[in-house]
Amino acid sequence: MTSTLHSTSFNTTRSKQVFARAQSLMPGGVSSPVRAFKSVGGDPVVFDRVSGAYAWDVDGNQYIDYIGSWGPAIVGHAHPEVIEALRRALEKGTSFGAPCVLENELAERVIEAVPSVEMVRFVNSGTEACMAVLRLMRAYTGREKVIKFEGCYHGHADMFLVKAGSGVATLGLPDSPGVPKAATSATLTAPYNDLEAVKALFEQHPDSIAGVILEPVVGNAGFIPPQPGFLEGLRDLTQKYGALLVFDEVMTGFRISYGGVQAKFGVIPDLTTLGKVIGGGLPVGAYGGRREIMEMVAPAGPMYQAGTLSGNPLAMTAGIQTLDILRRPGTYEYLERITEKLATGLLQIARETGHEMCGGYLPGMFGFFFTAGPVRNYEEAKTSDLQKFARFHRGMLERGVYLAPSQFEAGFTSLAHTEADVEKTLAAAREVLSTL
């Protein structure tokens, strides 16, 4: 790969044609809003194939990819061991609709790794996992109200589309048309990292809050880590008021550490949602937690939840192989080293080129904002210079670096990214930032 790809040679003719056709076939031309490049301008590039740390579009342009299918590709795209395992699984069938041994094998790995999980249920997406865990919180406690945090995204279910992040933040929507007031009337919101606001909600509703759900490290409003004591404070508050604490680790699970945020920070929730990495690039989700809570889920208990393709052999196979790769010695040390080099390099170059920028990283996950910061919550994230981010994104794209097309999304590194990839990325960033 050449060190940079300049705009004079950046041809996206075929991508434009494909996207133009897509807009007559699908709403906005995409299957998920952020892919349409609405917040950064211009037409999206249309991918043709991916391998390792790289993606190629239909015009033949090559990119260093820092989205990684929005998180699942932590071992790199199309990892040979994952592809071979899937090839063998395909020969046995794509979906059984019946129990299979692969479910046991992935469940055992999840339970072994994630401190809060004593039992697990597989579903087909992170949204589905969060929908089910919300129902379970209410079923177990007999209470209805739930606290979520502004800018935290837990999927597109009605009850979570209140001050949500991810695509909702990208489009600047406070919620979504079509969501009845009744669906969100029991959803309480607080600023992320604001323990006093959560205390106030519990004081106002001491006996009616089923639990608190959050991204323990926010990735759907940009990268925002928890302040010291915040997660611990939530654990104490929920225990004090008899409520449940739920970590949405769809993004962070098996990424920032093998056991997720809860293992790295030492704060153990009652329930956890998972997705992305545990499917190795195939559609998957899961929720799990304490045995006494999970035994409420049908058919063991009265709380109903089901899915035609849940636990399908292909997703289970890809997940098993991906987790086995991640368990190898040195994995997360490498992810931390490569992510640190990228994230600290971007901040240094921004300073040297005269731009206000703040940001941070954890192994395999990073983010930055065009503001002096600090950014501790969604409101502070919105102070970022979105026009500058859009110009930066375009400049990087033209130079062969694919970043998330939204200021309000985290970036991801993988085991396939090399120091040379990071150096090329930083060289491109210096070139772009010098012109903004």
Swiss-Prot record:
It is found in: Cytoplasm. It comes from the Bacteria. It catalyses: (S)-4-amino-5-oxopentanoate = 5-aminolevulinate. The modification N6-(pyridoxal phosphate)lysine is found at K276. Its cofactor is pyridoxal 5'-phosphate. It holds the Pfam family Aminotran_3. Keywords: Chlorophyll biosynthesis, Cytoplasm, Isomerase, Porphyrin biosynthesis, Pyridoxal phosphate. GO terms for biological process: chlorophyll biosynthetic process; protoporphyrinogen IX biosynthetic process. Pathway: Porphyrin-containing compound metabolism; protoporphyrin-IX biosynthesis; 5-aminolevulinate from L-glutamyl-tRNA(Glu): step 2/2; Porphyrin-containing compound metabolism; chlorophyll biosynthesis. One of its GO terms (cellular component) is cytoplasm. GO terms for molecular function: glutamate-1-semialdehyde 2,1-aminomutase activity; pyridoxal phosphate binding; transaminase activity. Its main location: cytoplasm. Coiled coil: none annotated. InterPro entries: 4pyrrol_synth_GluAld_NH2Trfase (IPR004639), Aminotrans_3 (IPR005814), Aminotrans_3_PPA_site (IPR049704), PyrdxlP-dep_Trfase (IPR015424), PyrdxlP-dep_Trfase_major (IPR015421), PyrdxlP-dep_Trfase_small (IPR015422). Its EC number is 5.4.3.8. The keyword Transmembrane does not apply. Homodimer. Belongs to the class-III pyridoxal-phosphate-dependent aminotransferase family. HemL subfamily. HAMAP family: HemL_aminotrans_3. This is Glutamate-1-semialdehyde 2,1-aminomutase. The lineage of its organism: Bacteria, Bacillati, Cyanobacteriota, Cyanophyceae, Synechococcales. The gene is hemL.
